[in-house]
Amino acid sequence: MKLLEQRIQEDGVMEGEDVLKVDSFLNHQMDVKLFQEMGKEFLRLYKDCGVTKILTIEASGIGIACVAAQFFDCPVIFAKKNKTKNIAGDVYTSKVESFTHGKVYDIIVAKQFLLPEDRVLIIDDFLANGSALQGLITLVRDAGATLVGAGIAVEKAFQPGGDLIRGMGVRVESLAKIKSMSVENGVEFC
């Protein structure tokens, strides 16, 4: 998606060789008009899949998922990283390692919201090593729901996550795929 690639070129900030900060428009301050265009693109890619739920993980995927859900006319579920008092009853759980934070989390979704008849589209802001996506896929499969695919804002194609998830037979559509990035040369797209 050229619009997202252009925004990354203009406003993304490199920190080291593998960290791209896009917090001015994607995952801290959010450009809702950009999200609307991203949501339209996800709909174009997955419109014939019968999506009934969008699943993401807290926190950075929530904004993109909510805007996209308007176009699919479906609810959003976000996996929580900690069990809280307001999640009662049975839950699906999975472990994920955060690339950004270097921590392992148990992610949780209440069983009442993720049903076997659901057709689920996973949406997230980044795909790097694939751990978050693997954890979300586990939740969908544990629920007996149908996974229609994953919509990713930014994929670091030079890291193993995309190949790993596609190798599991999951359809992955990334709006911006980064071939390489460095402080010296900036970001190069696939």
Where are each of the predicted segments found?
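Short glycine-rich phosphate-binding loop at a beta-alpha junction
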Residues: 51-58
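Short Gly/Thr/Asp-enriched flexible loops that form oxyanion-binding sites at enzyme active sites
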Residues: 63-72
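Active-site/ligand-binding-proximal alpha/beta "capping" segment
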Residues: 124-142
